[in-house]
Design a protein with these regions (language model features):
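Conserved donor NDP-sugar-binding/catalytic core segment of glycosyltransferases
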Residues: 115-153
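Short, well-formed alpha-helical segments that are part of the catalytic scaffolds
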Residues: 25-39
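Short, flexible, basic/aromatic active-site loop/helix in glycosyltransferases
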Residues: 141-142, 156-174
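A conserved acidic beta->alpha catalytic loop
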Residues: 52-62, 110
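Short beta-strand-to-loop acidic/aromatic patch adjacent to the donor-nucleotide binding site
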Residues: 99-111
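Glycine-rich, basic loop-to-helix element that forms the pyrophosphate-binding segment
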Residues: 79-98
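Acidic donor-binding loop at a coil-to-helix junction in glycosyltransferase catalytic cores
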Residues: 200-211
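Non-catalytic, C-terminal membrane-associated alpha-helical segments of glycosyltransferases
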Residues: 244-248, 262-344
């Protein structure tokens, strides 16, 4: 990895790796930053950049206070407002201007272990061998939800808030997310790629981003040991929230497959989605006595309903950028953290 240049103004050196965090009214950001302060940098030059998506620079005092004693460069960016794609693009722009090689990202309610960076770098380094077209341009790590007391048993046992890559039968990763991600900014498939601002409130901007990356010939690897954890707040630990999220995911999927299709073609796909939703609903009825099974089938049904609704002309719902609900959090040592809003 070659040193990044030119240097970011005001820094004694130019980090070759930037870790980006988008934030929106979350005091849990302090937990995130405390965990990043403890990572093993393995000799790499690393910086952390925060993109605040609030209308006002509400996270700036927290970031500046922590920056005074942070063991690596910590930069604050104000990227208003209430549109997660704007914040994600601000991180991309910062890393590209600094001519950094790698941009990693985690969310502002997540924390990492000391070996997280090393675990993320391993598959990327291994993927640099071979012809340019076969090199790894992105790495995804797993996201594990940490449930609070009182979470329904079926939800906790099913690990329904965990995130891992979607794969084809041959093992190839076919989608991506931004909660635990590495991007090689030297990869041609990432050249000038940006997050869709039109999806910045509904969600799905990460799915669309990685879909474009894959269409451009990009390749994604998985880092199973690069685990990040996040608290599942009470307002998200419900079947209603899971169904709403799956509905939105269905809308995102449909918006991608609807490209270049005629209205007749879209309506045909909507009919297929409706049939799949009905089948999932029937399976949910058959498993009425088994909550975990039933609710998984309902989530699958919601996915297909969302796809069908979008293909039939329904508008996308908004999940992000709205006033959040307060929820407790769990710190990396397992102790209760500060209570604060959940936003993006």
């Amino acid at each position: 990895m070659s040193p990044a240049s030119p240097m970011t103004p005001g820094l004694p050196y130019a980090p070759e790796i930037w870790i980006g965090v988008c934030t929106f009214r979350r005091p849990e950001l302090e937990i995130t930053l405390n965990s990043l302060a403890r990572i093993d940098r393995a000799g790499a030059t690393v910086g952390v950049v925060i993109a605040d998506n609030d209308s006002t620079p509400s996270a700036q005092p927290l970031v500046e206070r922590i920056a005074a004693t942070f063991p690596m460069p910590l930069i604050y960016l104000h990227a208003p407002e209430r549109n997660i794609s704007i914040a994600r693009n601000a991180l991309l722009d910062h890393a590209r201007r600094a001519r950094a090689r790698l941009l990693l990202s985690i969310d502002d309610d997540q924390w990492v272990g000391p070996d997280w960076l090393d675990q993320m770098l391993k598959p990327w380094r291994e993927g640099q061998d071979g012809a340019p077209g076969s090199r790894i341009g992105a790495v995804l790590g797993p996201v594990h939800g940490v449930y609070q007391p009182g979470t329904p048993d079926w939800m906790a046992r099913g690990r329904l808030h965990d995130t891992v890559p979607v794969r084809r039968r041959d093992g190839a990763i076919v989608s991506g997310y931004t909660g635990n991600t590495l991007l090689d900014l030297a990869d041609p498939a990432l050249s000038d790629l940006r997050f869709d601002v039109a999806r910045g409130r509904s969600g799905g901007e990460d799915t669309a981003f990685f879909s474009a990356f894959l269409r451009a010939g990009g390749r994604i690897a998985f880092a199973p040991g690069a685990i990040v954890e996040e608290t599942v707040p009470a307002d998200r630990a419900s079947l209603r929230w899971l169904l709403r999220r799956r509905y939105r995911m269905g809308q995102t999927h449909a918006s991608l497959i609807a490209r270049n299709r005629s209205r007749t073609g879209r309506l045909g796909q909507a009919g297929i989605a409706a049939a799949k939703a009905a089948a999932c609903g029937g399976m949910a009825l058959l498993g009425a006595g088994r909550p975990a099974w039933r609710n998984r089938q309902l989530m699958r049904a919601a996915l297909h309903i969302g796809a069908g609704a979008y293909l039939a002309g329904a508008p996308r719902i908004e999940l992000y950028g709205t006033p959040p609900v307060c929820a407790g959090s769990v710190q990396p040592d397992g102790q209760g953290g500060p209570k604060g809003p959940k936003g993006t």
